[in-house]
Amino acid sequence: MRPIWTGSISFGLVNIPVKMFSGVNPREGLDLDMLHKADHAPIRYARICRKDGEEVPWDDIVKGYEYREGDYVVLTQKDFDKANPRKTETVDITQFCDAPEIDLRYFEKPYYLEPVKGGDKAYGLLREALHESGKIAIVSFVIHEREHLGALVPLGRALILNQLRYPTDLRSGDNLKLPTTSDVTKRELEVALKLIKQETRPFIAEDYHDTYTEELEEIIKAKAKGHKLTVKSAKPHSTTPTDLMATLKASLSAKE
């Protein structure tokens, strides 16, 4: 793996040199191309200059901020680095807390942190301290020209930096029309709890994979051979309030 960032973890006055690696693989899906409907020729996207109508190569493209209509300030990598030199080079620990305090909606993307030569002992100390305390570290860091919030957690021998969303990144559900619990009977709740208990087991991520893509690949293979496919509608029927108890009981029986 190639590091996507090199800097240090700031733990009090201790600076731990680290490299950052992506903790996720690119999602493997079908590589679908955009085609012209008339002749099935691939569509090509181009970077066109609005002024002269010419295509612009990547080497001639820069980033800019429109501070007034039609007027731009061009920004270079040096400008991004100057904005806050410390934050561009540091994963700054701002506090510690218990993991359940963080709303699961905030978690966005994991990264691995690996100690650079000379940082092994301090890295190991922070990792063991987090293990022993049961706490996680809340951090701030800058990557891809943007400051992020993060949660630093130990996982085995590694330190994982989970990128977090800011509260302003989340939408409120206050305007949703949500039911109250007043219409739920005690008996319905008991049966629902039995179904949950019956389906409760340890979570093993390896048991899950993308079956939708696999089925879509089978459709593609069939169409490539000229086969016509007939697909039955699988739209689920909504359970009505009058059928709720009977359906819950049927679910219990089906799982036994």
In which residue ranges do the predicted regions lie?
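Boundary segments of small protein-protein interaction reader/adaptor domains
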Residues: 1-256
